[in-house]
């Protein structure tokens, strides 16, 4: 899990910024929702070999573990019709978030195993 600290720190910062911003503007006509998808099958995956963890992503691609982008968009659209601040557009995103939050040691073992 090399060279991921900047990515992880910036992702965490953007997530909490979005959550707080949503609370700050709740009484206005502005709507903020943080979207937390799992790895999604997008053109970005074509650049997988240029990342620091190509093996983990290639494994996910080969095993069909990437989320369908249309399903992700469908869930985002549904959640926009609610008061949700955070959108987890796939069951994989929900599972990953819960495992990381409640079982951090197990989460990091999974990450290391798949890296």
Language-model regions, residue ranges each:
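A transmembrane-helix-recognition feature enriched in membrane-embedded lipid enzymes
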Residues: 84-115
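Active-site helix of classical SDR
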Residues: 10
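SDR active-site lid
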Residues: 23, 27-91
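Active-site loop immediately N-terminal to the catalytic Tyr-X3-Lys motif
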Residues: 1-5
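Conserved alpha-helical elements of the SDR catalytic core
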Residues: 13, 20-21, 25
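Catalytic tyrosine of NAD(P)H-dependent dehydrogenase/reductases that use a Tyr as the general acid/base
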Residues: 7, 15
């Amino acid at each position: 899990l090399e060279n991921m600290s900047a990515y992880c720190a910036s992702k965490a910062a953007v997530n909490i910024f979005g959550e707080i911003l949503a609370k700050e503007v709740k009484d206005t006509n502005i709507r903020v929702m943080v979207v937390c998808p799992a790895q999604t099958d997008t053109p970005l995956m074509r650049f997988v070999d240029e990342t620091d963890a190509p093996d983990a992503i290639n494994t996910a691609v080969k095993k069909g573990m990437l989320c369908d982008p249309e399903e992700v968009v469908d869930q985002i659209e549904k959640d926009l019709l609610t008061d949700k601040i955070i959108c987890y557009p796939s069951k994989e995103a929900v599972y990953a978030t819960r495992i990381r939050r409640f079982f951090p040691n197990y989460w990091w073992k999974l990450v290391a195993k798949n890296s």
